[in-house]
Structures are given as C-alpha cells and as structure tokens.
C-alpha cells in the first residue's frame, strides 16, 4: 500500500499482460458509492450544485455518496437523498451500476431513480456546501450538450434514467 487515506487508498500492482509483459498499475481503492436521480411530481430532476476542489469549480450533479461499511446500497441511497436534498423516496429503484473510471480506480457506483419524494431531511456533512436546483426533465439534455452538466456520474446516471422519464 502506497497511501492510506480517509476515503481512498493507493496501491501499486505488478501484473502480467496477455502478451506476457510485466506492467505496473497504480490503483486507487475507493469504497463503492451510490448516485440517485430524484424526480419530483412536476417532472423536475433535483440536482445539487457544489464546489469540487479538483475541478476548481461548482458542478451540477445528482445526489451521490459513499456506501458506509456494512451498509446496503439502497439504504445509502436513501441516506444521501435525505442529507443532500432533504427528501426521502417512496419509490426508489435500482437502475444498474457502472465503474466510475476503471483505468485507475475500483470504485463501483450503484445508480437509482427516486420518485414519490417526501420531505425528510438529515443533517448534511460538515464539509459540504450544497445548493439544490430543480431542473425540468426536458432541459437535461441541453444542459449536458452545452456543458452545464459535466460530471461523469451525473451524465451516466441521467442516461440510465432517461427511459423512465
């Protein structure tokens, strides 16, 4: 292990490729996570705008977060909804999942759609400054096309949810 941190670890693997060549792979170990596409009764997607230091800008994203040790993904999804947008869902459905960036990390994200939203907040994480934005479903593709939504997990999650819209 090269580094052990609060939310990630870094390790170096030496592998043998299919062509019998030894190669080094640097791997970021990351807990699995959830991403949720919440849709209200008026056909708006509730997104969060928050500052992302590596990108050095505020990004418009779906609510998302890490799955705690021993926590089931659907429980984590409901917790993140309550923490980030102040709602719970009476209709939470798993859409599938995806590897966030399999070239260097083992992070797997479970993607959910949340409907039938009810106010039910939990305290937000101390280090998060989040603003909730309500976006009509029919504007989502334009926001992606014109670079207003640039976060990969958000684009992937919205794409997975589009058949439901």
State each model region's role.
Residues 9-13, 58, 108-110, 131:
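Short beta-strand micro-motifs in enzyme catalytic cores
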Residues 23, 32-35, 67-152:
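Unchanged
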Residues 34-79:
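Conserved Nudix-box catalytic region and its N-terminal flanking loop in Nudix hydrolases
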Residues 27-28, 51, 100:
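Residue-level structural signal for beta-strand termini and adjacent loop
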Residues 2-35, 41:
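Acidic, metal-coordinating catalytic segment for phosphate/diphosphate chemistry
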Residues 18-19, 40-42, 51, 114-119, ...:
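Short loop segments at secondary-structure junctions
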